[in-house]
C-alpha cells in the first residue's frame, strides 16, 4: 500500500467540524458560479451530515452553530481553494450579515434518503441563475457542479440500479436522486485486506518525512488540548477533569487532554486540528492519547511517530469497513481502537498485544451511538481515550479479549466485519429515529 498516499488523504488539517466544513466548501464553490446577490440557499443532506452539523460551533462566529449558517458563510465569504478550511478568514461583519439572511428565511435544510453517508447538495439561486454543488462520498469530494441545469464539473457519482437492473453513471442535478456509496480509493481497498500484523509492520516502516508529518499533527492537536485546559471551552470536560486529577496520573491525563481538545473543536474555536479518516474528532482521539502516553513515558520521537502511524492505520482500517459517517460513534470505536494499538506500541508491546487491545476497546465501546457533533462529544472522546489506555494495559498484561466475546473477536478483521454490519444494518433505524428526534424535516 502507498503509505504516503494514505496519510496525505486521510490525515490532514481541518478547521472546525468537517460536516459544516463540507457544506461551506460546497457553498463557496456554488457562489463562484452564481454572480450577483444570493436569493436563496437550499441544503439537501444525508442523515449523518444533518445530525453532525446541526449543533456544532462554526469557527470564527463567536459560538454560532449549524449547517445553515455554514452554507450562508460559504456563499458570502468562503474560499473554495481552501477546501474544508473555506471559512478560515471570515470576520464578524460577514457573520452578522449571514445571521440577517438566516433570520430572513433565506436558507432551507432537508434530510434526503438514498444517498451516501457523506452527502451535501447546496443549491444557490441568484438573479437568473441556479447552481447546485454536491459533495459526496468524502467531505472534500466534489461529485457534481450543475449550473442552470448543465453539469459543468465534479467527479460524478454512481447511480443506484434502476428497477430493470440497468445502471446509469455520471452526475445528476437532482439533489435527492438515489446514489450508492462511491467506491473506496484503491489504497483503502488495499488497507481493508490487511491483517493486523501487516498494519503493525507498515507503521514500523514509515520514512523520515512521514515521521515528521505525524509528529507535527500530534503537536497540532496537543496545542488544541492545552487551549481546552486553560480556558474551559464548550462543556469544559477536559478543564474540569484536569482540575480534579493528580498531575502524575497518566490515565487521567490521557482522558482530560483528549476531552479538552474535543471541547475546543466542538465549541468552534478558530484552531485547526489534524484529522483522521475525514474527522477532526477522530484525529484527536487517534493522536492525543498516544502523544500524552509518549510524553509521559519519555519514549523517542521515532517510537511516538510509529505509534501515531499505527493509530491512524487502525482507525482508517475500521472506517474503510464501516464507512465515513455511521450511527456508531467512530471517534470512540474506530479512533479509540487506533489509540489503544498506538499506546501498546508506546508501552513497548508487540502486534499480538496491540490487536488484543483493539478488541478490548471495541468490546467496551462498540455500542456507543453517534447523536451528532456537539459539545458533549468531549465526554465521548474523553471516555474513548481513557478506555484506550485501559485496553492497552490489558493487552500488555496479556489479558482482555482473547477469544470471541459476544460480537467482538480478537481478530481485527472479524470484528471489523461485525462492526460494519451492525453499523449499516443493525443501527440504521436508530440513526433515522435520532434524526427525527433532532427535527430532521425540511425547515
UniProtKB/Swiss-Prot annotation:
Disulfide bonds: none annotated. It comes from the Bacteria. Residues 156-178 are annotated as: Disordered. GO terms for biological process: L-cysteine catabolic process to pyruvate. One of its GO terms (molecular function) is L-cysteine desulfhydrase activity. InterPro entries: Ser_deHydtase-like_asu, UPF0597. Belongs to the UPF0597 family. This is UPF0597 protein Dvul_2496.
